């Protein structure tokens, strides 16, 4: 139906009118009616539908043949119907052709009715015509609607076909573009292959040079070592091959699974193709399904894109968080530095407090002999002790609260210093009273005892310092062990990374093979397209030939000759097809083999290059780690130097303070003798008051002991809290260090290729860093100045408080006017101390400048040393070149001898076996030569340990070269002896020459092939060697710097021990001198001068020692560098031999590994995902634990604050009670005279108790230090474990990223494969359609050959629809096939090969001619 509607044209009515048969025209209307709602023939009067024309004739005769009226009314009705039809034509202009055909059909029906029925009555005819016209109008309207709907459906079908055509065009364009891209890729690959061949040629030349170097004689001892290493390497390679075989088996299983899935998918594709071939109706359904699938695919791609965008956002957030984390870590480091400085300040204050405690002990020894002033001073001392204890607690709180209460702590420390000044003033007053009361001998003895106590204290301090040094040494050893462990772990991780990279490379090779297979498929598709085009051209040629044949047949020329020609052409074409297919198969197979060989070669070269790149990367990472360790060690050394300087300054300040005290004591002795007579009268009054005060003093001492016990408990709690805080801070620092290590590993992975270029820039950056450190130190100096200003402000505040206290203590001012003068002198001393501190700061700046100058000098020395090393390198290379030239001469002689031996070896098989044995002996001798070379290198390294004996070392090398020449001459003699033996064998075995010539030629060819392989491998070896030399030179340079720093540390420790021994000796001398102070005051000045001279000598000696050590370090660096070069040469040779064996085995197992590694990567991916989830859970649990610990610390801090407040309240209450008791006991001062003796005894016992308490405190401090050691050990272990965990996480992340990348690439390849499969399906469908068309053309060809002009008598029915011919149903011949049809089946006209004009044709022939 659709074809008929499409084939209707407005000009067809004219063509139909031109036909000879007038009865053929009504068929169009019949078709329209048949395809409308009614079926068959319709009666024009009653509009009844009938099955055939005979039935319509009978119906009309039986029903409507009532009478014959006049025809005038009918003619009028016809005119009316014509007017109505014209109106309908105007209303329906879009369907003019169909309306004309319907009108013409109605007129023809009327003519036939008039012929067979005659005239009827006019009235009946008029009524019948009116009804007929109305019925016809309704039928026409229905037909119009149907035609519109059919047009709409046809348009939809046309749009679908156009969409399909557009899709096919786009796919063809994509295929062509991919073909062009693959062509370009192939050209690039060919270029790469040419470059690789050039590189191989270069490497062959390099390998030949290396052969000349390797033919040098080694020592005998290194052969065993090399054998052991070879055995180890072979075992490792066996294990690797076993693992790779397992992986290949797994990959084969997966490949089989994939192939089965591929076969299943191909079966489903074939089913879909068969279903598509069933009919065009199902095409639309499949198209819709395809569109739905495409929509779902688009949705999935959008989801994937959204997920990738989310991942990218998360990655960006992660990077931001890492940056924030780095900033916080930097801020924490700055805070830690500031806390460290404040801790140092606190230590200085504690040192001052210890000095004040010693002065308090002296005051307690002298209290028993003082008067009323002593009571008030003791009360003030107790108040100072209580305030000092409060200040200690507050200092610890300040350490916890850090930034909030720093100012308050500084104010309290200022108050403590002022109170200590007052204590010193009171001590001087007590000393005056004590000097008046007692004789000079007692004073001297007591002072000697005090100095002995000071010496003991200093000895204790020295012992503590020695213990601390020992602890630091043990810590350093532990750190070294940890470093070694971490290095081992790092090496293991590098091995794992290398294995993972090898697996990934194998996977990449598999992917390249898959891509290559896809390219082959694309080429096949293109070939099929070319074949399709050729088939279309052949079809067009066949159609032209068919038309020629039709013309010949219609012209009446020989049909048999034409058929024979066609058969011969078909036979010839089939033979050509078979030949061409065989040629194509052969060419395709050869082409595939060539491509596979090229691909294998390219993959081998890529594997070699990637292995070399991995080694370079591993060496660069090791270099960077060593450099970081060097920097850390340098920082530690600088910190130790700073600590040592600070301690030496403290010792010097303590000695200066002692000298000042001695001068003060002498002045006091002189004044005390004069004041004794004046104060004897006052003693009687003071003695009474002392009796009363002793009782109070005992009670208060008991109270102080209780308070000290409480203080100890609080200190222990506070220490435990501090340890927890330090543990948490250490954990945080470790996490920060791990994060920094992760970032460093990322940056190292990204910048490993650019490190060699940036070596020059690194030096400039180091200079800039040094300048920044200087600026930071200047900032520290400015901070110290600000602290001094703050302290001056605190002093002013203290002065204000002093003025208030002076107003309250007017009575004391009258009695202690002398003390005020002493306080003024102390203020002056404080100002002097401030000035001394400023001078010390300037000295520190000068030291910094000196250090900078030393740095510049050391850099210049290093440059000079590097120049000298370069000169020595050039000399050594010249000597090596000379040795190489000698060895080349030897090799040439050996080669000539080998050629002679090969010519003579062709004579006999036995001679060949003897030659093989001799070759093995020569290999052994070559190994011995290598061993001798190594021994020579060892001798060279030993000779270079002393730079002064370089000339002697050169002479030794020349001697060894002479020995080598002698050994070469001995070898020549051996070869000549072998030649003699060979000649004897030739004379005996001339019979077997003909047979063995062929075998020897084959062996020579094999040897040449092996030599080519060796040359290719050695070229790779030389490139790797050059890279390794550069990297290892950097490594050994940094190792030499490390050794120098360690030696400097050792020298510093030795200096410390010497200084300590000097200090101990000086202190012993001071103790001996103190016993004879009165007798040797005159000799004191001379001894001090001697000590000053000794110190100057010590400084000069220390400078000389430093210079000598620097020279030693420079020389040792040079020796280490030369040793490293020799060791590098040996290691490089061993590595290259190992790499040759590895490469030979890797070439065999490369194809198997690629399949195994994909399965391993998938398993590893799943394991890593699981481990990632577990680690995330652990991290969450750790975070929760951290939060709990923080909350517990806050609660503990609040409790400590509450307890402190309670104690302050108790202390205030007790102070009030003490004041009340003092007022009560002032009345009973007279009784104090009797209890003087008792008090003196009690004071001595108290001093002993204080000594025991100090010893206990020292033992507790030792315990604390031991516990701190244990905690440090535990922290180190925790740090190691956390570092391993972090490294594992980093490795897992890297593997996950690689897996994700691999999955993305696999998905891309899968999409490409699906697209290619679709294209294959389309091409196969097109080929099938072409085959069908060819079959249909062959059928039509046979039909055309069998066609005959049918006769009217033989055919009674239509040959298409089967209608019986009658008067109404007439016969019509098809001008194409010659068969007879009815008018309905032969309505169409078309051009045929036998006619120039359009001729009546049946529907089938019309479709054939038009299609």
Curated annotation (Swiss-Prot):
* GO CC annotations, alphabetized: axonal spine; cytoplasmic vesicle; cytosol; early endosome; early endosome membrane; endosome; glutamatergic synapse; postsynaptic early endosome
ZnF locations on chain (FYVE-type): 1352-1410
Tell me the Gene Ontology biological-process terms attached to this UniProt entry.
chemical synaptic transmission, postsynaptic; endocytosis; modulation by host of viral process; vesicle fusion
Cite the GO molecular-function annotations of the record. Answer: 1-phosphatidylinositol binding; GTP-dependent protein binding; protein homodimerization activity; zinc ion binding
UniProt lists compositionally biased (Basic and acidic residues) regions at 481-490
What residue intervals correspond to the zinc fingers (C2H2-type)?
Answer: 41-64
Q: Where is this region: Disordered?
A: 1-27, 476-501, 1189-1217
Q: Which residues hold Zn(2+) 2?
A: 1374, 1377, 1402, 1405
UniProt biased composition (Polar residues): 15-27
| Principal location class | cytoplasm
Residues in a coiled coil are 78-1348
- Binding residue positions for Zn(2+) 1: 1358, 1361, 1382, 1385
InterPro entries associated with the record: Znf_C2H2_type (IPR013087), Znf_FYVE (IPR000306), Znf_FYVE-rel (IPR017455), Znf_FYVE_PHD (IPR011011), Znf_RING/FYVE/PHD (IPR013083)
> How does the protein associate with the membrane?
Peripheral membrane protein
Q: Which CDD domains match?
A: FYVE_EEA1
PROSITE patterns linked to this entry: ZF_FYVE, ZINC_FINGER_C2H2_1, ZINC_FINGER_C2H2_2
Show the ranges annotated as biased composition (Low complexity): 491-500
* Record function comment: Binds phospholipid vesicles containing phosphatidylinositol 3-phosphate and participates in endosomal trafficking.
Quote the record's domain comment.
Answer: The FYVE-type zinc finger domain mediates interactions with phosphatidylinositol 3-phosphate in membranes of early endosomes and penetrates bilayers. The FYVE domain insertion into PtdIns(3)P-enriched membranes is substantially increased in acidic conditions.
Q: Which PANTHER family match?
A: EARLY ENDOSOME ANTIGEN 1
Its protein name is: Early endosome antigen 1
Taxonomic lineage per UniProt?
Answer: Eukaryota, Metazoa, Chordata, Craniata, Vertebrata
**Gene designation per UniProt:** Eea1
């Amino acid at each position: 139906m659709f074809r008929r509607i499409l084939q209707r044209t407005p000009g067809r009515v004219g063509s139909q009118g031109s036909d000879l048969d007038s009865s053929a025209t009504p068929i169009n209307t019949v078709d329209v009616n048949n395809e409308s709602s009614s079926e068959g023939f319709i009666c024009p009067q009653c509009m009844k539908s009938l099955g055939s024309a005979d039935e319509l004739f009978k119906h009309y005769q039986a029903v409507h043949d009532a009478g014959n009226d006049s025809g005038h009314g009918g003619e009028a009705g016809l005119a009316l119907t014509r007017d109505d039809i014209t109106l309908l034509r105007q209303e329906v202009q879009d369907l003019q052709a169909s309306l004309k055909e319907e009108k013409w059909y109605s007129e023809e029906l009327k003519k036939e009715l008039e012929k067979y029925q005659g005239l009827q009555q006019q009235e009946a005819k008029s009524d019948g015509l009116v009804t007929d016209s109305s019925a016809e109008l309704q039928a026409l309207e229905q037909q119009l609607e149907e035609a519109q709907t059919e047009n709409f459906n046809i348009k939809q079908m046309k749009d679908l076909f156009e969409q399909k055509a557009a899709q096919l065009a786009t796919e063809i364009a994509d295929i062509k573009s991919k073909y062009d891209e693959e062509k370009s890729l192939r050209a690039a690959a060919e270029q790469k292959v040419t470059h690789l061949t050039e590189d191989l040629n270069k490497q062959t030349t390099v390998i030949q040079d290396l052969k000349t170097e390797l033919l040098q004689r080694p020592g005998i001892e290194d052969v065993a070592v090399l054998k052991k290493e070879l055995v180890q390497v072979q075992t490792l390679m066996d294990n690797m091959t076993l693992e790779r075989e397992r992986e290949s088996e797994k990959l084969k299983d997966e490949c089989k699974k994939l192939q089965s899935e591929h076969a299943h998918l191909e079966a489903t594709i074939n089913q879909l193709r068969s279903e598509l071939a069933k009919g065009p109706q199902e095409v639309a359904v499949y198209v819709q399904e395809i569109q739905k699938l495409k929509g779902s695919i688009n949705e999935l791609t959008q989801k994937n894109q959204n997920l990738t965008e989310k991942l990218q956002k998360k990655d960006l957030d992660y990077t931001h968080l890492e940056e924030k984390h780095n900033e916080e870590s930097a801020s924490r480091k700055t805070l830690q530095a500031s806390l460290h400085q404040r801790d140092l300040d606190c230590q200085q204050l504690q040192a001052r407090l210890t000095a004040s405690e010693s002065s308090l002990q002296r005051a307690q020894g002298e209290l028993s002999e003082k008067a009323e002033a002593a009571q008030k001073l003791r009360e003030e001392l107790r108040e100072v002790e209580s305030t000092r204890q409060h200040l200690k607690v507050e200092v610890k709180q300040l350490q916890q609260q850090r930034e909030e209460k720093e100012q308050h702590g500084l104010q309290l420390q200022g108050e403590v210093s002022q109170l200590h000044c007052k204590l010193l003033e009171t001590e001087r007053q007590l000393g005056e009273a004590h000097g008046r009361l007692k004789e000079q001998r007692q004073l001297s003895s007591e002072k000697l005892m005090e100095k002995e106590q000071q010496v003991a204290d200093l000895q204790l301090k020295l012992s503590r310092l020695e213990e601390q040094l020992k602890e630091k040494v043990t810590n350093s050893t532990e750190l070294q062990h940890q470093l070694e462990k971490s290095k081992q772990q790092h090496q293991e991780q590098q091995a794992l990374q290398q294995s993972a990279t090898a697996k990934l490379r194998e996977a990449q090779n598999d992917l390249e093979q898959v891509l290559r297979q896809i390219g082959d498929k694309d080429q096949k598709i293109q070939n099929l397209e070319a074949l399709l085009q050729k088939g279309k051209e052949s079809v067009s040629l066949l159609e032209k030939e068919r038309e020629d044949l039709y013309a010949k047949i219609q012209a009446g020329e020989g049909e048999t000759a034409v058929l024979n020609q066609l058969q011969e052409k078909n036979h010839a074409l089939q033979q050509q097809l078979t030949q061409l297919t065989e040629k194509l198969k052969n060419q395709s197979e050869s082409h595939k083999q060539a491509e596979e060989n090229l691909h294998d070669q390219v993959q081998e070269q890529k594997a070699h290059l990637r292995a070399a790149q991995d080694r370079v990367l591993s060496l660069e990472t090791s270099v960077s780690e060593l450099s970081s360790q060097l920097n850390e060690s340098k920082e530690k050394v600088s910190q130790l130097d700073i600590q040592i300087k600070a301690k030496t300054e403290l010792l010097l300040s303590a000695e200066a303070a002692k000298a000042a005290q001695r001068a003060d004591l002498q002045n006091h002795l002189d004044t005390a003798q004069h004041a004794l007579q004046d104060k004897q009268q006052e003693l009687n009054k003071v003695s009474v008051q002392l009796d009363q005060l002793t009782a109070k003093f005992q009670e208060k001492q008991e109270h102080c002991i209780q308070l000290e016990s409480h203080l100890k408990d609080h200190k222990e709690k506070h220490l435990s809290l501090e340890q927890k805080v330090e543990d948490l801070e250490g954990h945080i620092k470790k996490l920060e260090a791990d994060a920094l290590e992760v970032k460093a590993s990322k940056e190292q992975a990204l910048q490993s290729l650019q490190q060699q270029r940036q070596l020059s820039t690194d030096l400039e950056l180091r200079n800039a860093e040094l300048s920044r450190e200087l600026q930071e130190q200047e900032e520290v100096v400015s901070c110290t100045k600000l602290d001094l200003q703050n302290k001056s402000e605190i002093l002013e505040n203290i002065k204000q408080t002093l003025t208030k206290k002076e107003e309250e203590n007017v009575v004391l001012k009258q009695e202690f006017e002398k003390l005020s003068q002493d306080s003024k002198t102390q203020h002056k001393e404080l100002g002097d101390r401030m000035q001394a501190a400023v001078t010390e700061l300037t000295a520190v700046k000068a030291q910094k400048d000196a250090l900078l100058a030393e740095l510049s000098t050391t850099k210049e020395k290093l440059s000079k040393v590097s120049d000298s090393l370069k000169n020595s390198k050039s000399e050594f290379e010249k000597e090596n070149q000379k040795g190489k030239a000698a060895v080349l001469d030897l090799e040439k002689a050996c080669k000539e001898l080998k050629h002679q031996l090969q010519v003579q070896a062709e004579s006999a098989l036995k001679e060949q076996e003897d030659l093989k044995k001799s070759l093995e002996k020569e290999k052994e001798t070559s190994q011995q030569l290598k061993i001798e070379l190594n021994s020579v290198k060892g001798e060279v390294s030993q000779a270079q340990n002393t730079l002064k004996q370089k000339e002697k070392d050169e002479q030794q090398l020349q001697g060894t070269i002479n020995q080598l020449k002698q050994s070469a001459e001995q070898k020549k003699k051996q070869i000549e002896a072998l030649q003699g033996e060979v000649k004897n064998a030739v004379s005996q075995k001339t019979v077997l020459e003909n047979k063995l010539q062929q075998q020897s030629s084959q062996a020579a060819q094999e040897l040449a092939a092996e030599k080519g392989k060796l040359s290719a491998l050695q070229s790779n070896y030389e490139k790797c060697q050059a890279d390794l030399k550069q990297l290892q030179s950097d490594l050994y340079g940094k190792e030499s710097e490390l050794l120098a720093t360690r030696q400097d540390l050792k020298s510093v420790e030795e200096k410390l021990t010497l200084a300590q021994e000097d200090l101990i000796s000086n202190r012993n001398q001071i103790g001996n001198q103190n016993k004879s102070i009165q007798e040797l005051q005159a000799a004191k000045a001379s001894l001090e001068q001697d000590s000053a001279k000794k110190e100057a000598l010590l400084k000069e000696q220390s400078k000389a020692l430093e210079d000598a050590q620097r020279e030693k370090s420079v020389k040792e660096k040079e020796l280490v560098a030369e040793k490293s070069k020799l060791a590098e040469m040996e290691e490089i040779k061993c590595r290259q031999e190992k790499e040759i064996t590895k490469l030979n085995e890797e070439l065999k197992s490369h194809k198997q590994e690629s399949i195994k590694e994909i399965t391993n990567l998938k398993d590893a991916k799943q394991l890593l995902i699981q481990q990632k989830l577990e680690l995330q859970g652990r991290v969450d649990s750790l975070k929760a634990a951290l939060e709990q610990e923080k909350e517990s610390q806050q609660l503990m801090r609040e409790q400590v604050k509450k307890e402190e407040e309670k104690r302050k309240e108790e202390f205030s209450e007790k102070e009030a009670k003490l004041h009340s008791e003092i007022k009560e006991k002032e009345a009973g001062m007279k009784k104090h005279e009797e209890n003087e003796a008792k008090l003196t005894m009690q004071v001595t016992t108290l001093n002993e108790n204080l000594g025991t308490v100090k010893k206990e405190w020292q033992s507790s401090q030792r315990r604390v230090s031991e516990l701190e050691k244990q905690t440090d050990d535990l922290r180190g272990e925790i740090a190691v474990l956390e570092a391993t965990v972090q490294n594992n996480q980093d490795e897992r992340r890297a593997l996950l990223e690689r897996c994700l990348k691999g999955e993305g690439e696999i998905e891309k390849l899968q999409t490409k494969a699906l697209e290619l499969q679709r294209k294959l399906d389309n091409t196969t469908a097109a080929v099938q359609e072409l085959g069908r068309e060819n079959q249909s053309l062959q059928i039509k060809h046979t039909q055309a050959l069998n066609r005959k002009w049918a006769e009217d008598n033989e055919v009674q029915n239509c040959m298409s629809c089967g209608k019986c011919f009658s008067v109404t149903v007439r016969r019509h011949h098809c001008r194409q096939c010659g068969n007879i049809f009815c008018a309905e089946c032969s309505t169409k006209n078309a051009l045929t090969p036998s006619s120039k004009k359009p001729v009546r044709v049946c529907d089938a022939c019309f479709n054939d001619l038009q299609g």
